[in-house]
Structures are given as C-alpha cells and as structure tokens.
C-alpha cells in the first residue's frame, strides 16, 4: 500500500481496553483537528439486555478505572445498565476464618469512599466503550488483522475488512495477540496449571455488598457480589479438578463450592451455566518499537485473584492517551519510538510489580494448612492491624496511589 495515511492511529482489538483507548484518542483535539482513529475488532458484542442473566465474565473495576471510563465517555452507559458496587472485602486463608485473627478486611469507609469499586460484565464494558468511541467520531471496522508492513513514514495495516495506513498501530488484542506476533515482539508466558472456573450462584444469606476471597491449598475462591443478590464466582483449581467441577451435577457442585467457601454465605446454589479458562502469567519484555505499541493483556496478564487485570489495562490506555496528547501538542510524530518509550517506561515497571505481587501472594497464601498457612495468617493479621499498611493496600487496589495518569486521578463529574 505505502500511500497516503488513512488514520493517525489504528488499534487492533476492540475489547474494553482497546475501545476505551480509542475513545480517549478520538476525543482529543489538536492544532490539526481531531485525531483519526480506527479500531479493528473481530466480533462486535451484542447489545446489553438488562433482563438477561448476568454474564459469566465480569471484572472488579477500581475507582481509577471508573474515572478513565468517565473520561472516555463510556461510564454513563455502564451506570445506566447494570453495575454492582461493593463496599467491603474479606480475605482469609484455609485454616482461618473470614472475620477472625489471621484474616484481612477492607471497608470503603476507611477512605471515605462510597465503595471499593464495582463489578461489571466484560461485554457491557466493551459495548459501552465502543459506543463512546463511535460517538467521538472514531471509525470501527469488523475483521481480522492479516499483516503489518512498517516503513519510516507509517504502517500498512492489512485486514479482512480492508487495508489502511497509519502513523501508529496499537496492539490491544489480548494475550494471544496477533498484532504482537506480526510486530515481532515476544511474550514470556508461565502456565499456572490451573483453570479459573466462573459461574453465577445464589447465596443462602445476603452478601451485604461484600467481596469474599478465600485462599485454599489447591487455589483460590472469590465471591463477587452482584446487585440482584447473586454472586459471580472465580474459582481457580488444578485443571483436572476444575474439569470435574464443570461436569458435576448442580447439587454436587453446590455442595463442593459451599465447602470451599467455608459456608460464609450459607449454601451457594448454581444459577445457569459454568465455564472455565486457563490461568497464565504473561509479560512482554518490550512494549514498543517504532510505530507500534502494546496495551492491556497483549502486554501483560496477571493472576486474577485481585481483579487487577483489566484495571492495569485501563491505566495503560490512560497513560498512552496522555503521552500521545503531549506529543501531539508538541508537534511530534505519535509513532516515534522516543514517544512510545516514554509510555513503556511509565507503565511497564508498575505492571511488572503488580504481576510479581499477585504471583507471590497467590503462591504464599495457597499452601492450605500447616506451617506456611499459619505464617500467612499471621501476615494477614499484621496487615489488618496496621492502619498504615492497610490504607496503602486499599489505595493501591483502587488505583489511588502511585504514578497514575491524569485521567485516572480526575474525579467523576
């Protein structure tokens, strides 16, 4: 192709992170007018149906992510459809109790916040972000990436939807990123040998807008409260055991799940289908080359135990949007490696730190019973008794501390 530029930025992947980045960029104005942004997505999500059951794939959005979605123009559609704020969280290891010694509890009131975050379906986030992107004047193409051709002036983007030429291509197409592979960037992948089993269950007792997380010898169990009184579960198990739980009759599944939860909410009854996906840790050693950059799961995948995966992706989107806005204001080429390395330096260290922390916490707290478990309980108990340590953890989880992008610090409204 190697002709005239058709777009300033082409984003490969229109999931929640890619679509949000697209909306942020499309809303930017510069001396030459609005940025020309195209998002390429393989398959568009169906319109959300508030009457339909809650989807199996959900995310725990931090306060910082909420602010990024507000800046992108996507939050009103989410707030108007279905979201589930949670106000408290209890964490405890096997051998302990959820509110006893050796547990860790968080309360939004400790930060004078209305909640710690909210549970939102991934498809709803994606639909809202794509809607905001189109409303901002972005171009949405449905198709698959077929090739990338780089030269000094731009990138030829070959897709099943047509061919484009851009100054910058962003890989936002997830852990199995085709864009990353075509750009020649590597990824270090570690398989945990586990599956994350997801389902929606109805607890016997009210969940009290509280998230519950129990570390077990064979994995972790998270109960995420939903606005209709049900809970979304994420239960990480060794692969063979997870497959058995998928095949269990509902009554047997309920019995085993209730036991794994330590009966904290009484009997947990299955509602609807179950699904599972493999757990892997992924880190890209490099995020950027000339005219190409990675965001979200294409750059990093962390253990889901703290729900930080999509939140890291939204921080990537906000940081890249800020770096590109600065470059645009200064008349710089958005695809220049110097510009993209500024984003990489900003986000890679934080993402690697979070990944290592999630990996370490999971390994340390998932020892079941015994000496290591008792040490874990003492550690959790110490943090729970230290107002300073606890506040630092809450602020970190909510995205309220550290070198966060301006859009993530800006309060809604």
What are these regions (language model features)?
Residues 26-55:
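Glycine-rich FAD pyrophosphate-binding loop
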């Amino acid at each position: 192709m190697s002709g005239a530029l058709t777009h300033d930025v082409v984003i490969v992947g229109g999931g929640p992170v890619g679509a949000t980045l697209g909306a942020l960029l499309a809303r930017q104005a510069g001396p030459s007018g609005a940025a020309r942004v195209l998002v390429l997505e393989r398959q568009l999500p169906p319109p959300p149906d508030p009457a339909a059951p809650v989807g199996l794939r959900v995310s725990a959005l931090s306060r910082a992510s909420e602010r990024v979605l507000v800046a992108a123009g996507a939050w009103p559609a989410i707030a108007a459809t279905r979201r589930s704020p949670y106000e408290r969280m209890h964490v405890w290891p096997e051998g302990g109790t959820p509110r006893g010694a050796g547990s860790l509890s968080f309360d939004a009131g400790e930060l004078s916040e209305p909640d710690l975050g909210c549970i939102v379906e991934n498809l709803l986030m994606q639909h809202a972000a794509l809607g905001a992107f189109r409303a901002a004047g972005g171009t949405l193409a449905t198709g698959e990436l077929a090739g990338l051709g780089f030269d000094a002036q731009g990138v030829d983007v070959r897709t099943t939807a047509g061919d484009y030429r851009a100054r910058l291509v962003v890989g936002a197409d997830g852990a199995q990123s085709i864009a990353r592979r075509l750009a020649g960037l590597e990824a270090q992948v570690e398989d945990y040998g586990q599956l994350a089993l997801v389902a929606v269950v109805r607890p016997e007792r009210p969940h009290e807008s509280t998230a519950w997380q129990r570390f077990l010898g064979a994995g972790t169990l998270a109960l995420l409260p939903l606005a209709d009184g049900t809970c979304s579960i994420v239960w990480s198990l060794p692969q063979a055991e997870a497959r058995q739980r998928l095949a269990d009759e509902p009554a047997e599944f309920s019995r085993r799940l209730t036991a794994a939860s330590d009966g904290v909410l009484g009997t947990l009854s299955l509602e609807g289908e179950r699904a599972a996906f493999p757990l892997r840790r992924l880190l890209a050693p490099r995020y950027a080359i000339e005219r190409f950059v990675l965001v979200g799961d294409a750059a990093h995948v962390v253990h889901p135990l703290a729900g930080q995966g999509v939140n890291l992706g939204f921080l990537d989107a906000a940081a890249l949007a800020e770096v590109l806005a600065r470059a645009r204001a200064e008349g710089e080429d958005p695809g220049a490696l110097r510009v993209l390395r500024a984003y990489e330096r900003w986000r890679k260290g934080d993402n690697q730190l979070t990944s290592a922390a999630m990996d370490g916490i999971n390994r340390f707290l998932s020892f079941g019973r015994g000496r290591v478990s008792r040490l874990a309980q003492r550690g959790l108990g110490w943090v729970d008794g230290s107002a300073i340590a606890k506040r630092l953890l809450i602020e970190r989880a909510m995205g309220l501390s550290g070198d966060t992008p301006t859009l993530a610090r800006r309060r809604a409204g």
